[in-house]
């Protein structure tokens, strides 16, 4: 009996270790990349960072291939693959560190997430959904310095640890139900204003059906609900009410919409 118990214990430990390695591989690891907590009074600034990253090439591509509704001309990106690859190589050649300001880190990680997502679609185009690709968020497709991160690693291992819920409305997963892809690059000099705009636009868009008593929200508020529990709140209502044109009652019924994973492509 003791031998069986010991074997059982070993199996449990082995399973736990294996699960942890899978968890890391599943896109939750930051691969040691630096993160900083965003202060409550975040301001946009380029003056307090050891590095100022040039995102102008990405800005030019976005203005050319993304419309104001956030729909993407992936055929156009495919034609401009060289310019896109040059920008990706620039980002990947950099190694963020603690001397970077929180503003530069936010802009860098948001842009690299969005740019590599576009590149992933272009690589597999034509497709109907990002979910048609094997492991889009779990494979190490994003080289940063000597490391290779997954898109999930950037989102879960870095951006979500920065104590900034608004990142959920800045990163784009190439799908209809995602917050729209801005047709401008995020920059340290405008980061706070850009995050505010992205958050307000998404909450007041048709991705959410907001009313005082019965509200149907994007699944983002279900999947990442704890990220929106700020100032001691235990639900998402208070956070949404900061931005919503319609105030939700504290005891309102909250439901969540099905997510549309169809490609956010210009028609």
Model-derived regions, located:
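Positively charged n-region of N-terminal signal peptides that target proteins for export
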Residues: 1-6
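Sec-dependent N-terminal signal peptides
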Residues: 7-14
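C-terminal motif of bacterial Sec signal peptides marking the signal peptidase cleavage site
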Residues: 16-19
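Interaction/scaffold regions that mediate signaling and macromolecular assembly across diverse proteins
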Residues: 22-99, 103-108, 115-267
